Amino acid sequence: MSSSVPNSDRKIVTGPAGYILEDVPHFSDDFPDHPTYPNPLQDNAAYSVVKQYFVDEDDTVPQKIVVHPDSPRGTHFRRAGPRQRVYFESDDVLACIVTCGGLCPGLNTVIREIVCGLSYMYGVKRILGIDGGYRGFYARNTIHLDLKTVNDIHRSGGTILGTSRGGHNTTKIVDSIQDRGINQVYIIGGDGSQKGAAAIFEEIRKRKLKVAVAGIPKTIDNDIPIIDRSFGFDTAVEEAQRAINAAHVEATSFENGIGLVKLMGRYSGFIAMHATLASRDVDCCLIPESPFFLEGSGGLFEFIDKRLKESGHMVIVIAEGAGQDLLSESMKESTTLKDASGNKLLQDIGLWISQRIKDHFAKKMTLTLKYIDPTYMIRAVPSNASDNVCCTLLAQSAVHGVMAGYNGFTVGLVNGRHTYIPFNRITEKQNKVVITDRMWARLLSSTNQPSFMKQADKIHSNQLVGEPGTMKW
């Protein structure tokens, strides 16, 4: 690494052959004389057999791993993990954990593993849980967290800390952090919550407080960029199979039966796409990224008619954000409303399209349509085995980063390696399905559905290029 280049508060390090490190802030940036201490892990018997357990300071992870011989080395992120020196003495730490936004499988596992990581690995004894999301900071609601408190919470869905949307008041939150003497803040939440975490970090930095802020990204839709996937996603795809299986049973039990399942996916159709591929029983998958139309040649109604004549039944999976442009003008008026987190309130596309299908085929054939919306069932369940491992590693990586003095970062899996990512990279855009990518082609091949694209849409889609860092298989 050769030089550090200021870029509107971004910490950019450049090196030979086009190497770029998008680094995260560190305590040494603001407090160059801050003392450091030997990492307690070096005396931990559990890690005594691990060779090279501590991460080298120069270890980085590339954002893009598929390259050509003459490609520049490209963007990298700092590799997560424990360092040989830490910036906090265990007895001086007062940590807090907060969960924000909607529910997601794995929240309790992340809480548990932050507590266990701080306690077992670093000997931290004072850990607070902020009750009820961001507003819990200035409502003075806290829960004392220790190993006994969190022992079996991973077996339950939801979050023992409670959550809420909105309620972010940066000044009041940082006042509370300062008044309580908190010096480590762990924020578990989606893109909106990570923006809030970034604002908290900037205010803390402005006040020159020796407080570390780390984010653990939470989004069941998997719409956070850069990272391979977010925790809870695998569980959501697995749980969605129950609804799809039920829809398939209903559809095959009636003449011209249609099972319609609405899954989560406000702007990104990853759950719908992966649940469809996992099921193999779905005939049509509709997502926000791929426009469709109902009537005319190549439209949805024509495909439904064709499939019912061929098979006598059909299963459709639709993401909640798909087809919003097709809703009637009277329904569109209310879509300008937003929830407390600033998300646009969507109309129920599942109910609307169910009625449109029934109306269209009413005079053509006897048709039975069953509509299933498992949204809250899916997000309220405990995380599965895969997500439990994911949550554990994310939580431990966040703890290692904070103890090592890193600050103002989100932890995430990039190309199979855990990394520390600047807040701005996580919040600048959303991760979406690239419909010109091979994964969407695999889905179309699996369902044998048409693309539902009109000629103008096809021309536009051919101009799209997938972002490096989106989900790759």
From Swiss-Prot:
GO molecular function: 6-phosphofructokinase activity; ATP binding; metal ion binding
The name this protein goes by in its record: ATP-dependent 6-phosphofructokinase 1
Presence of the UniProt keyword Transcription regulation in the record: no
Gene assigned in the entry: PFK1
Known tissue expression: Expressed in roots, leaves, stems and flowers.
UniProt binding sites for substrate: T219, I220, D221, M264, G265, R266, E320, Y376, M377, I378, R379
Cofactor: Mg(2+)
Family annotation (Pfam families): PFK
SUPFAM superfamilies with a match to the protein in the record: Phosphofructokinase
Residues given in the record as Mg(2+) binding sites: D191
Function text: Catalyzes the phosphorylation of D-fructose 6-phosphate to fructose 1,6-bisphosphate by ATP, the first committing step of glycolysis.
Modified residues (Phosphoserine): S71
InterPro entries, sorted: ATP_PFK (IPR022953), PFKA (IPR050929), Phosphofructokinase_dom (IPR000023), PKF_sf (IPR035966), PyroP-dep_PFK_TP0108 (IPR012004)
Root EC class: transferase
Record organism: Arabidopsis thaliana (Mouse-ear cress)
Family: Belongs to the phosphofructokinase type A (PFKA) family. PPi-dependent PFK group II subfamily. Atypical ATP-dependent clade 'X' sub-subfamily.
Metabolic or biological pathway: Carbohydrate degradation; glycolysis; D-glyceraldehyde 3-phosphate and glycerone phosphate from D-glucose: step 3/4
